[in-house]
Amino acid sequence: MTNENLAVEKKNIINLFNQKKFGKISKISPKIRNLFEDQPDIIKIIVMSDLNTKNFIKAEQLLKKAVIINNTAEFNYILGNTLKIQDKNSEAIVSYKKSISIKKDFSEAYNNLANVQKKIGNFDEALLNYKNAIKTKEDNLEAYYNLANLYKSLKNYVEAKKNYKKVIEINPNFSDAYNNIGTIYSILGKFNDAKEFYIKSMNVNRYFAEPYKNYVQLCKIDEKDQVFKNLKEIIQKENLDEEQKEVFFYSISKAYFDIGNNDLAFKYLNSANKLKLEKLDYSFSKDKKEFKKIKEFFLNKKLIN
């Protein structure tokens, strides 16, 4: 391909990317892809398009070539993310470590390395690398939140609470952190403190369902309870996220049982169960389709052999 044709192809790729036509970019032939191996900006565009269209294998193949030519921290980090998505955990760890060896203060790489280490049960290493992520970037909210979650799962509630509070210090509107502090207080039997933090979580994000569920499980609800009044308003809202709606329905069902209105309690309990079954049916349908694809793949392999 002439330099002029290559320039035209490059311009076309950039235009498609600006138009968010990721599918068209992802379908670019291997021959064309290889022409841009030494052009990091175009490689990133093609890889991002592959990831947007869930063509993870294509992205992985291109990145593995790219790191040979441009062994940068960024390319190794993106390769690590691509491998992580595919549950190729050992390879992802290698890529994140390469990224960090090139750029010692790469906070995001430390954080994602820790995420993979946590996933495979290497908790001590995960704790260390979440702390490294924070050390290299003091306002890394995600690393603080992940560190808090890991401490919580390890039942180190003092450290978990401390790190959730750091999350809130960085972002006072982080409703999950308030809710999780509430859960810790509930586990420790400090129910008034738990209630306070569940309410704070609701105040920060009115449509985050989890603190409502936790609150109604903790308290006996009466009709004067402001949380109950809020629940009645929220469930009338259109376009609620289906998963959130399911939790809201369970929450108000429990509230109506407390109040003694069993008809409405069962009505919302049935609605919640229906949403749950629909979600399970959808997951089962997806699993069946995936199994069919795998089955066809192996049948085709037999035919080829």
Name every feature range the model reports, one short phrase each.
Residues 7-28, 35, 45-48, 52:
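Alpha-helical segment of the N-proximal tetratricopeptide repeat
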Residues 35, 68-69, 102, 136, ...:
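Structural marker of alpha-solenoid helical repeat scaffolds
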Residues 39, 72-73, 106, 140, ...:
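Residue-level recognition of tetratricopeptide repeat
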Residues 44, 48, 77-85, 108-119, ...:
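Conserved alpha-helical positions within TPR/SEL1-like repeat arrays
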